[in-house]
């Protein structure tokens, strides 16, 4: 991968705020984990995890090789993640202009 890669931050939150504290116990959370595993297998996953100050919310960083792949990243996040497609999570797909990384 090079500096022309497409980076995105995916910000996930429960569609129903009442499940925020128990999101990890909900069986639909497994769909989200499966999505993250597929992204790792594709080599796109940089990092993923819950936000310590926001129960039930999380962030995922994806890096897709090549420029101009935001539409593909959006499709992956909204259609390929069954936890989003089913309405369990909402997701904000944010293009990320990375200026420095290790």
Regions found by a protein language model. Give the residues of each.
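Conserved, structured core segments of small domains
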Residues: 1-102
């Amino acid at each position: 991968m090079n500096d022309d890669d497409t980076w995105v931050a995916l910000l996930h939150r429960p569609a129903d705020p009442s499940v925020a504290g128990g999101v990890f116990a909900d069986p639909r959370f497994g769909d989200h984990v499966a999505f993250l595993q597929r992204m790792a297998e594709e080599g796109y996953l940089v990092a993923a995890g819950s936000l310590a100050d926001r129960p039930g919310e999380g962030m995922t960083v994806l890096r897709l090789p090549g420029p101009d792949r935001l539409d593909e990243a959006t499709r992956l996040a909204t259609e390929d993640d069954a936890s989003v497609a089913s309405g369990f999570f909402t997701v904000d797909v944010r293009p990320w202009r990375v200026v420095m990384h290790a």
